Amino acid sequence: MFIRIVKLTLLEDKVHDFLEHFDTIKDKVRHYPGCQFLEVYRDKDQSNIFFTYSYWEDESNLESYKKSELFGEIWPYTKTLFKEKAEAWSVDKVVTLK
């Protein structure tokens, strides 16, 4: 399992569009084979910056998603809302404390 973090910097006037669109596709993404968890975070100081945080079973699942028809529908539209190019990281969890 690994974690995928994607930073999305949106045009300020497109934040509402992003949130509405995400609401329509979030369940499809979350239930894509291999996706185990999905959250979206919003920066407290810059309200047009979001982070998606997802757990994937393995890298082949994420690659399959990125080549899927679903991603092909989501990503081109989402990119039209960007102020800056998206940044993405695939990371392994090192420590969890509760």
Predicted regions and their residues:
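Glycine-rich beta-strand-turn "strand-cap" elements at beta-sheet edges
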Residues: 39-46, 76-98
